[in-house]
Amino acid sequence: MDIVHIIVLSLVQGITEFLPISSSAHLVLVPKLLGWPDQGLAFDVAVHIGTLTAIVFYFKDSIFGLLRDFFVSIVRRERVGDSTLVWAVCFATIPAGIFGLAFNSLIEEYTRSGIVIAVTTIIFGVVLYLADKRVGTKSEYDVTIKLALIIGLAQALALIPGVSRSGITMSAALFLGFSRVGSANFSFLMSIPIILLAGGLESVKLIRHDISYVWSDLALAALISAVSAYICVKLFMSIISKMSMTPFVVYRLILGVFLLFIFV
């Protein structure tokens, strides 16, 4: 890949991965506007590694304690500390895992068009706006297994390009009475196993197809996506602690209309 392609697409992935604005919409739009070829499977794996590193580093002060409580709860077969939060993340991952394995081929075949991405970007932007009006006070530590499964079902919708995984999970959490910060934190925690699964599947495909790649290019892509994703998460959390999701809703609507203009 050209160095400019690597920098731009890595920044796009890092900036949009955790914001409720649909990374897939941007990764379709940028190459389309610039006339660039598909970035390839190896690049996808690299930026997934980068964004995963970013979110793990963001939760560095709590993630090891959460994992400790989780594994101790397994050994003792009882709730320990904040183990329920980790169990909730695990259960929230199940719906997307099941639907992904069952319908991934169909989704790839029928929903990867620019028009579909444009329409879903607009529709679920409106959903985010409506959900933001229902904002509550629950934090991520108030999540139950039942609530996690509901949010997990919403996450399964993000298999459709343009929906936005972070956008739909935050929307579901807001509808269920979570605060903006609480919904974002739980959404980000949910992203860890999802990115691991997606990156793992892509890695398997990469190995099976014996695709050639340049290690320095992949390292650069991972680094740029990691740094940009971490900065965006920090800024996003600062923004929603002080104001509503409206700026992101407006951006989605503008983006969706722009995509319709390009692809219709």
From Swiss-Prot:
Transmembrane as UniProt keyword: yes
Subcellular location: Cell inner membrane
Gene Ontology BP, a term: peptidoglycan biosynthetic process
InterPro entries: UppP (IPR003824)
Catalytic activity: di-trans,octa-cis-undecaprenyl diphosphate + H2O = di-trans,octa-cis-undecaprenyl phosphate + phosphate + H(+)
Principal subcellular localization: membrane
Keywords for the protein's UniProt record, in alphabetical order: Antibiotic resistance, Cell inner membrane, Cell membrane, Cell shape, Cell wall biogenesis/degradation, Hydrolase, Membrane, Peptidoglycan synthesis, Transmembrane, Transmembrane helix
Topology of the protein relative to the lipid bilayer: Multi-pass membrane protein
Principal EC category: hydrolase
Gene Ontology MF: a single term: undecaprenyl-diphosphatase activity
GO cellular component entries: plasma membrane
Keyword Secreted on entry: no
Family: Belongs to the UppP family.
Additional detail: Bacitracin is thought to be involved in the inhibition of peptidoglycan synthesis by sequestering undecaprenyl diphosphate, thereby reducing the pool of lipid carrier available.
Reported function: Catalyzes the dephosphorylation of undecaprenyl diphosphate (UPP). Confers resistance to bacitracin.
Protein's name according to its UniProt entry: Undecaprenyl-diphosphatase
Organism: Campylobacter curvus (strain 525.92)
Gene expressing this chain: uppP
